[in-house]
């Protein structure tokens, strides 16, 4: 066998092997999910975004909530009978608000109990989805996060604060436009959060929590712990032992 053939075999191995390994991992995950569904009597749906290494080159991809995710999750919800509870296992840094909003509203409308399971973190749009649940089952060290909207690379609340600290004549047109968009984004997100939680918390408490989570009180990556989430009024259950 000549050198070029050996090189082709070497290249083929390092292309095919990672794919086979990933398929094996996926098969094990599906098996574990099906066993868990039988034990809990629920339909388990997963929304998992991890930084995955790809092949022997060590390249990686970072995943976020997108429209493809919402299509898949909504399809799974539609295929779940009304009398079957849903467990949504979520692990995500967040992502596209539209996609997260679609998932949250679909979960909210499901007639049976909805539990969102957070093994590690569900930030931003992930937290928005969790707000639609009847119960949020979190690992003791898992975290949620604020859902304040981001405009480009800046928090909407910070854009408004910067503009309000200056005279209008001292602010360029582009920044004024960003401030207008920021105001709309803040109102829309606050109203969405209120829609998701007001039935459970009541109007006054629901609006208070909606403001807290959207007003830019914290940085966007601020970790809301299990205890803090419970203090805010979220239906959090710490997973201190196997259930």
Question: Where on the chain are the PLM-derived regions?
Answer:
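Short glycine-biased active-site loop of nucleotidyltransferases that positions the nucleotide triphosphate
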Residues: 128
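Residues that form or flank phosphate/diphosphate-binding pockets in enzymes
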Residues: 98, 124-125
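Long, distal/terminal scaffolding or interaction modules
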Residues: 109, 123-124
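Terminal-region recognition feature
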Residues: 1-118, 131-243
